[in-house]
């Protein structure tokens, strides 16, 4: 089957917004384009209850630019306008149910103007990296179902101990699945991999190393 579009939604807060970057760096590698962020929160979330509150000024701007800066091609606000009845009545939005702008509307308007100014650069460039970090669903499942290391949370450790240190060093990695091609990379980091038996990775990475690639595994 053909994958038509890669899309992502999140409701991270200012405290953990940086966690989302790993997902954008991963989703970007799945398909050349398009990759869309289809639920960008302007403020709080809310289904049957509100579990977040008003975000600080500037949060919406950062949250809106992240998917675009990291390779996305669309950024859609959820909600654009609050419901007049039914589910998620308390969800944050750009406009309220009557159509009046909510407190973040001015920030959204400025973001749209900034997108327009940067349109030629955004449309004319792609996010490329010579460094990759492996992340696979199989290894995630193994770590979650067979606790090889007591109390180790796979995603938190991957983010805090491997991904973030790369970012802090000024390295912008592609986050790749085991089946992804390796040719574009000079350095590949494969953390927390309980198995590499996916996508013929052992043979492919051995050849890649013989061809001059540097592999950090552990």
Predicted segments, located by residue:
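Carbohydrate-binding surfaces of carbohydrate-active enzymes
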Residues: 4-218
């Amino acid at each position: 089957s053909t994958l038509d579009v890669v899309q992502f939604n999140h409701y991270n807060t200012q405290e953990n917004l940086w966690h989302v970057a790993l997902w954008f760096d991963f989703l970007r590698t799945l398909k050349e384009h398009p990759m869309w962020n289809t639920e960008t929160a302007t403020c709080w979330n809310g289904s049957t209850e509100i579990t977040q509150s008003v975000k600080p000024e500037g949060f919406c701007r950062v949250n809106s630019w992240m998917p675009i800066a990291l390779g996305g091609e669309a950024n859609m606000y959820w909600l654009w306008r609050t419901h007049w009845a039914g589910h998620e009545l308390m969800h944050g939005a750009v406009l309220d149910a009557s159509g009046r702008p909510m407190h973040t509307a001015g920030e959204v308007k400025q973001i749209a103007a900034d997108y327009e100014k940067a349109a030629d650069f955004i449309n004319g460039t792609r996010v490329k990296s010579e460094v990759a970090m492996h992340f696979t669903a199989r290894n995630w499942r193994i770590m979650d179902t067979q606790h090889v290391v007591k109390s180790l949370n796979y995603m938190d450790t991957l983010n805090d101990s491997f991904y973030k240190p790369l970012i802090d060093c000024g390295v912008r990695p592609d986050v790749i699945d085991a089946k992804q091609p390796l040719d574009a990379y000079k350095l590949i980091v494969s953390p927390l991999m309980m198995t590499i038996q996916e996508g013929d990775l052992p043979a492919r990475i051995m050849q890649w190393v013989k061809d001059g690639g540097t592999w950090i595994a552990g």
